[in-house]
């Protein structure tokens, strides 16, 4: 359908919990949801992302798309959409994240990445694009993506989970880019790729 701008940290839509997608009495989803999902896929693909939440493109609905390997370095990927996701995870470690294995980035924090503590396993249940029940789960990178995208839908960025020196580094990065204010976005496919793809 269309590649659309991705909102940058500081935009209120990223820091506000999303609303559930309305489901009809017959289990049907809104007719215009298909266009939103297509735009989300196009935008995620153009940005070379592994996931994208609706509020990252300015739509406050509880839906995300993904195209993610089960773990780093693997070429086989899983691709899909989850509407009205509910997240379940294993325990999140209370130790400092490892900068070599726990690095995480975000399309709404373009070009930056920071070690982030996440559960090693996660499952999301919800609906697919046709309103059918869906349950997806995984370990490693896939689990990280599930937690990251549902976090967006709850009104949080991964920066909100950072601790210690990583949180301080992220605050400096946001300030140095003049982010943290409403109205900023970037357009995948235009200009240099902030992630170097």
UniProtKB/Swiss-Prot annotation:
Cofactor needs: Fe(2+)
Single GO BP term: translation
Keywords associated with the record: Hydrolase, Iron, Metal-binding, Protein biosynthesis
Catalytic activity: N-terminal N-formyl-L-methionyl-[peptide] + H2O = N-terminal L-methionyl-[peptide] + formate
Binding residue positions for Fe cation: 106, 148, 152
InterPro entries on file: Peptide_deformylase, Peptide_deformylase_sf
Keyword Protein biosynthesis: yes
Domain of life: Bacteria
Top-level EC class: hydrolase
Entry similarity comment: Belongs to the polypeptide deformylase family.
Function, as annotated: Removes the formyl group from the N-terminal Met of newly synthesized proteins. Requires at least a dipeptide for an efficient rate of reaction. N-terminal L-methionine is a prerequisite for activity but the enzyme has broad specificity at other positions.
Protein name: Peptide deformylase
């Amino acid at each position: 359908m269309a590649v659309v701008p991705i909102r940058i940290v500081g935009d209120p839509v990223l820091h506000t919990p999303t609303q559930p997608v309305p489901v009809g009495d017959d289990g049907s989803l809104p007719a215009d949801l298909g266009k939103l999902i297509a735009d989300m896929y196009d935008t995620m693909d153009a940005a070379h992302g592994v996931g994208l939440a609706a509020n990252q493109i300015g739509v406050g609905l509880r839906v995300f798309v993904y195209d993610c390997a089960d773990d780093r370095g693997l070429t086989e990927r899983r691709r899909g959409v989850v509407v009205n996701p509910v997240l379940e995870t294993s325990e999140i470690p209370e130790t400092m994240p490892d900068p070599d294995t726990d690095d995480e980035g975000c399309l709404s924090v373009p070009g930056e990445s920071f070690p982030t503590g996440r559960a090693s396993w996660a499952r999301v249940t919800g609906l697919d694009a046709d309103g059918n029940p869906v349950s997806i789960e995984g370990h490693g990178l896939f689990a990280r993506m599930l937690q990251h995208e549902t976090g967006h839908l709850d009104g949080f960025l991964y920066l909100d989970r950072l601790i210690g020196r990583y949180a301080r580094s992220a605050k400096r990065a946001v300030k140095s880019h003049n982010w943290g204010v409403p109205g900023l976005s970037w357009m995948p496919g235009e200009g240099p790729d902030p992630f170097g793809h």
